[in-house]
């Protein structure tokens, strides 16, 4: 993490790229309609996973990082939630401006929901019905490991638990803000009680 709180990630795929179709089928056999599959492009066979999950009427959330041809080989019309930063948003749309990224994604994939994270500039949620913005939770960034996972996990848990997208965006932002203020990956992820307390303090 540099002095501005930004991170630099080096990826070594290892076992992440050793999935087989048989293994995917076995795992997905335990899930059905309305269950959630969360994907990041650190594993292989994401196109196959998307297709099988869609057939089962699952909710499909995707973070297309690291962005490469494997993402474009997927039928992205099947994605329920896109979690992207400005770089991935530009790769999907060819646009740099956040407003144009949101418009571009929804033009291509009108049934999807987009969560666009902009680092210190906050985050946006957009779908065919509208958009909402959430500023960052200002903290001293100590370690950004697991911040994105914390954000997406809390957002999905919140919105699927009945919160509005705006409420879910706030909850996710608070949770990831707490996470970056601590060292480590899993140990940095706050409990639901911690997040609820912090959200209450902000009201």
Residue locations for each model-derived region?
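Conserved N-terminal subdomain of the carbohydrate kinase-like
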Residues: 1-36, 51, 56, 196-203
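Active-site donor-binding loop signature of nucleotide-sugar glycosyltransferases
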Residues: 12-14, 84, 136, 191
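Conserved phosphate-binding/catalytic region of the ribokinase-like
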Residues: 69-70, 99-203
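Conserved beta-alpha-beta core of the PfkB/ribokinase-like small-molecule kinase fold
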Residues: 36-104, 122-123
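A short acidic, helix-capping loop that chelates divalent metal ions and anchors anionic groups
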Residues: 7-10, 88-92, 188
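Structural alpha-helical scaffold elements that stabilize or flank donor/cofactor-binding regions
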Residues: 29-30, 74-75, 107
């Amino acid at each position: 993490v540099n002095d501005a709180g930004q991170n630099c990630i080096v990826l070594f795929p290892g076992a992440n790229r050793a999935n087989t179709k048989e293994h995917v089928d076995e795992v997905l056999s335990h899930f059905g309609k309305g269950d959630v599959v969360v994907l990041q492009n650190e594993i292989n066979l994401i196109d196959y996973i998307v297709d099988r999950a869609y057939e089962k009427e699952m909710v499909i959330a995707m973070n297309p990082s690291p962005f490469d041809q494997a993402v474009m080989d997927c039928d992205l019309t099947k994605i329920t939630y896109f979690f992207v930063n400005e770089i991935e948003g530009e790769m999907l749309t060819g646009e740099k401006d956040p407003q144009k990224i949101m418009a571009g994604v929804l033009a291509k994939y009108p049934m999807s929901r987009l969560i666009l994270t902009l680092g210190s500039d906050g985050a946006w949620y957009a779908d065919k019905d509208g958009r909402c913005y959430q500023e960052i939770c200002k903290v001293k960034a100590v370690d950004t490991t697991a911040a994105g996972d914390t954000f997406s996990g809390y957002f999905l848990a919140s919105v699927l638990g009945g919160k509005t997208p705006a409420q879910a965006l706030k909850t996710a932002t608070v949770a990831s803000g707490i996470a970056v203020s601590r060292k480590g990956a899993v140990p940095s992820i706050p409990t639901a009680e911690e997040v609820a307390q912090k959200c209450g303090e902000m009201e």
